[in-house]
A protein has these predicted regions:
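Conserved alpha-helical scaffold segments that buttress catalytic/binding sites
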Residues: 2-151
Length: 151
């Protein structure tokens, strides 16, 4: 089974899984890498997060002892889209590009995971979902807790 354009094989797929488990027609999970960084104010590099996550994921064990299975098989596989090129895109342009990247997959029955960089990148994915699901509630998981009290 040949992968369609816009999708990655085992070399760049989440977990490094091979066909047929990384094929988008079969997979129940889509990973959509959209690296973006423009408003970071301290240490730069959040735009490298999606590629670092994909690279590190190849070291993850497939078998989950608590579940007693290889979850990606239970889900039909995990397909990873080719990374969205956001070079030269700033703020609204990047948000619009990410929204356009994610929108075609919303409502398809796939579980979508969008890997961005900084906080702004999530807005495009959220807008894509909110356009289809107006009552959407968002829980955003950040790299840190942001639990420091205001001074």
């Amino acid at each position: 089974m040949t992968l369609p354009a816009g999708w990655e094989g085992a070399d760049h797929n989440f977990l490094g899984i091979d066909e047929p488990w990384c094929h988008p027609e079969q997979a129940g999970v889509y990973v959509l890498p959209a690296p973006y960084e423009h408003t970071s104010s301290y240490i730069l590099g959040s735009d490298r997060g999606p590629s670092a996550i994909l690279e590190a994921s190849a070291q993850v064990e497939f078998y989950d002892e608590q579940l007693g299975c290889e979850p990606f098989r239970e889900w039909g596989g995990i397909a990873t889209a080719t990374t969205l090129d956001l070079q030269g895109s700033v703020d609204g342009q990047a948000v619009d590009a990410i929204q356009a990247f994610v929108a075609p997959h919303v409502g398809t029955g796939k579980f979508l995971v969008t890997l961005t960089g900084e906080h702004t990148g999530a807005l495009g994915a959220i807008r894509a979902h909110a356009a289809r699901y107006p009552e959407l509630c968002v829980v955003q998981i950040d790299a840190h807790g942001d639990l420091e009290s205001s001074r």
